[in-house]
């Protein structure tokens, strides 16, 4: 790490987060059964209104976006800890909506995040990963939807990403979800964990 004397100045002026930092304790709940909106938590961390979400209406089980922290640009990949909905292609009855479980990575979100990681890598923007996941969705419907292909695409994008990566474990980080979110195996530049964080290859 660079000392404060040799560290380059941020390219943008720093700004206070849109929400007070103390509100993190009101937003986040360590109880695995409780839900919260990851965007509210990010609002307590990033500079002002700098968070620019990437494809907000697609792959909602993962929140991706560009932001600034203390004036320094970064990409953010965070698990969504609340139920979300996704549009499903319909048959005779037409399109329908399905409910996504909290903290689970679905195929559409994995696809979106892989593309976002590749974009950050091309733009030389460091990435912050905020872990709160129980892993990838399993089951017949998920496999028919392409979770294996999408999950492999996400892990491949991660393994080829050369920009600095920071991992923040705020709750659970289990199974293949830990790998997809830049777990220890990908040697992140820095790993931080809240006191209640739990991390394991098998959940």
In which residue ranges do the predicted regions lie?
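Ligand-binding clefts of soluble mixed alpha/beta catalytic domains
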Residues: 1-203
């Amino acid at each position: 790490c660079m000392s404060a004397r040799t560290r380059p100045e941020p390219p943008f002026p720093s700004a206070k987060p849109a929400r007070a930092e103390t509100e993190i304790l009101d937003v986040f709940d360590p109880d695995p059964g409780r839900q919260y909106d990851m965007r509210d938590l990010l609002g307590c961390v990033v500079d002002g209104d700098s968070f620019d979400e990437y494809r907000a209406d697609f792959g909602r089980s993962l929140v991706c976006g560009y932001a600034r922290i203390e004036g320094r640009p970064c990409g953010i990949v965070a698990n969504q800890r609340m139920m979300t909905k996704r549009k499903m292609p319909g048959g005779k009855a037409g399109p329908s909506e399905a409910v996504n479980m909290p903290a689970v990575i679905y195929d559409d979100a994995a696809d979106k995040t892989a593309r976002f990681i590749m974009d950050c890598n091309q733009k030389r923007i460091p990435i912050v990963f905020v872990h709160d996941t129980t892993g990838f969705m399993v089951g017949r419907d998920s496999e028919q939807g392409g979770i294996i292909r999408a999950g492999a695409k996400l892990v491949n994008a991660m393994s080829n990403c050369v920009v600095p990566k920071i991992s923040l474990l705020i709750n659970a980080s289990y199974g293949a979800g830990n790998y997809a979110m830049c777990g220890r195996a990908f040697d992140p530049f820095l790993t931080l964990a809240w006191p209640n964080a739990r991390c394991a290859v098998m959940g």
